[in-house]
Amino acid sequence: MGEARVESQLAYAGAVSDEPTIRPAYDGSSVAFRALEAWGWGELVNLGYYPLAALPQLVFGMAPFQRRLVERALELLAPAPGERVIDAACGRGGTTSRIARSGAFALGLDLLPENVAEAEARASDEPRPRFAVADVTRLPASAGGIDLDAESFDAVLCLEAGFHFGPKGRRAFLEESWRMLRPGGRLVLVDFVWRDARPERIESLDPDRFVRDTWRFSEFEPLERYRATAREIGFAERAFRDWTRPVIDRFQHIATALARTGDTRAGRALLCALRPGLARIRPDEWRDLVALMRAHGEVRRASRYVAFRLEKPA
C-alpha cells in the first residue's frame, strides 16, 4: 500500500485532506454497521462494555452495554452543574444528552451533518444539549452560534472516535482540546490504541484492509505516543483505565459467534427471530461478516482499549 492510499482513508479534514471519508463507516453501506444497528446501535454508537454477569442481557441488544461504557466514561469526566463541556465527535448525541442531564452545558460537535441532525431530533427538550457541525481537529471560531473561544470550557470528552482522526489529526485534537480548556480543565479520551510502537504492523495484520476500510482509519495510535504527545502539549495524566477485556475482547468473541451463527440457515432464522432487522442481511453478507471478524481478531490482538483523564494544570 502506498502512503497516498493510506492517507486517503483518513477521516478528518483537518488531518490530511479537504474531504472527509468517515461517512461510509456509519451510513449503512457496510454490512458491519447494518448488523450492529439491527442488534441495537441507535442513539449510541460504541462497542459497549460487557461484564460477564450481564452477558445474558445480549438477547435484548447492545444498548444496555453501550450505556455502561458511557457511564464509565462519564465517571471519569465527572461533569458538574454549571460547567461547559464539549462532546467531541458526538455521533448521534446520546452521550451529549447524558452530559446535559448532569446540569452542565453540553455542546456536541460532529463532522457529519446527518449525525448532528439526528442528534438534534433525538435530544429531549429539558435539559437540552446543543449540537453543531465542526471538525474537532480544526475548530472554527464558533459552531452552532456558540463561540469557541480559548479557555472557555471546563471539560472535553472524546469517546471512541480518535482512531478516525489519523496521526496528525490526533495531535491536532489534543492541541485544540488544550486550547479550549480552562486551567484545571480535563479531557477524557477513550480510544483504541496500538500495543507497541509499530502501528505500521497493521499492514500485515489487515492485508486486505477489511478492518480499516470498514471503519475508515489508517492506524491506531501507539499508547506511549499518545501519552508522550499529551505530555508535550502540557497535559498531566490523572487517571488511566484499561478496558481491553470488557470491551474489545468480549465484543470480538460475541460478534464472531453471531457472525458464524448467521452463516448457517438455522442460525439466521434464530437471529432474525431475536432481531428482525437482521433479515435485511443476505447470506453472502453473513459470510463477509465472518471474514471481517476474522480480520478484526488479528488487529484486536495487537490493540488495547483504554481511557485517559488528562488535565490542563491550573
Annotate each PLM feature.
Residues 141-156:
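A short acidic, Gly/Pro-enriched loop at the edge of an enzyme's catalytic core
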Residues 63-81:
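Conserved alpha-helix/loop element of class I SAM-dependent methyltransferases that forms part
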